[in-house]
């Protein structure tokens, strides 16, 4: 982590304030990330992340203690990780953005995040998306949810039938060879912002 980022994190931790974090290999500051959403007015990641952690910082007790004191609104993971369970502690999280999620086989780390409304994931191999749907069902927020799955192999999408909340955008970039994505994801529902990218 760069020293300026460490100072920003210390200050946010001392105030128990809001912040957003990126995670990359070397901890060099990331000024932002691409925004997949068509309607970007609701994207909170336009001016964030404020702090960038290196992968090794996730094992640093002092740094992670400061992260835990903050209200993390956005988490942008730019590198494959072995373990994503640390995300569970971000109860204020609104935006979770994961590139290179090839080590993700389930979404059990997505829980107790009542404000989560932006979720983007790449390259994961998932059994299902039930934890994400259940998390959003427990939300009191009226904000429309936006989900993006890029080249994710997802065996079972039937949890979408239980999505009794507004989905503003559902973006699917199917893995090569998958052709039944519309039927699998919509399950008879109408989602105005549904797009498949072949």
Where are these regions (language model features)?
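Extreme N-terminal leader/targeting regions
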Residues: 5-9
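Concave beta-strand-loop units of leucine-rich repeat
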Residues: 14-63, 69-82, 86, 92-105, ...
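Short intrinsically disordered terminal tails
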Residues: 1-2
């Amino acid at each position: 982590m760069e020293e300026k980022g460490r100072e920003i994190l210390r200050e946010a931790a001392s105030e128990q304030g809001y912040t957003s974090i990126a995670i990359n290999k070397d901890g060099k500051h990331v000024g932002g990330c691409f925004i997949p959403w068509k309607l970007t007015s609701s994207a909170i990641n336009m001016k964030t992340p404020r702090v960038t952690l290196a992968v090794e910082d996730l094992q640093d007790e002092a740094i992670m203690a400061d992260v835990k004191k903050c209200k993390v609104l956005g988490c942008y993971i730019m590198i494959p990780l072995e373990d994503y369970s640390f995300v569970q502690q971000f109860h204020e999280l609104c935006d979770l953005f994961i590139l290179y999620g090839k080590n993700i086989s389930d979404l059990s780390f997505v829980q107790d995040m009542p404000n989560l409304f932006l979720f983007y994931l790449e390259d994961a191999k998932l059994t299902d998306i039930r934890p994400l749907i259940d998390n959003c069902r427990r939300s009191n927020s009226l904000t429309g949810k936006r989900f993006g799955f890029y080249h994710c192999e997802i065996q079972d999408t039937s949890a979408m039938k239980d999505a009794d909340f507004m989905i503003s955008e559902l973006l699917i970039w199917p893995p090569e060879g998958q052709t039944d994505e519309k039927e699998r994801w919509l399950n008879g529902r109408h989602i105005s912002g549904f797009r498949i990218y072949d």
